[in-house]
């Protein structure tokens, strides 16, 4: 009887792990100015969410660097434009820009970086996106962030 109870408990625990929300995503970037996804979905049950950015290309960050910035969709282009003068040392982001929800640093070939942010910063009725703020990259390197 005890063995059955233990077995049932373990199966219940294991199935709970299978259905737990995945509160992390890895996004790859390339020398062809692209991310490997156009959409990031965040489960409402996540307290925090982590985005890991990798760069599978061969070029250094000063030539083909990438970062990943999360903001409201309406703020994406203004953030990228305002960040141009900040330069690579500040990840092409204006210092203290509170329109930025989260961002990784600019990385080059073979590098990776991650950022973890509080999901409570996102509202269900707002549209969010992600993009690369390296000059000129936002035109091809962007996608949606959805709270589901």
Curated annotation (Swiss-Prot):
Keyword Metal-binding included in the entry's annotation: yes
GO BP annotations, alphabetical order: electron transport chain
UniProt GO MF annotations: copper ion binding; electron transfer activity
Sites where the protein binds Cu cation: 66, 132, 137, 141
Cross-referenced CDD domains: Azurin (cd13922)
InterPro entries linked: Azurin, BlueCu_1, Cu-binding_ET, Cupredoxin
Compartments, as annotated in UniProt: Periplasm
Cross-referenced Gene3D superfamilies: Cupredoxins - blue copper proteins
Domain Plastocyanin-like: 21-148
Pfam assignment, any one: Copper-bind
Disulfide bonds: 23-46
Signal peptide: 1-20
GO cellular component terms, semicolon-separated: periplasmic space
Source species, domain of life: Bacteria
Function according to Swiss-Prot or TrEMBL: Transfers electrons from cytochrome c551 to cytochrome oxidase.
Annotated protein name in UniProt: Azurin
Species for this entry: Pseudomonas putida (Arthrobacter siderocapsulatus)
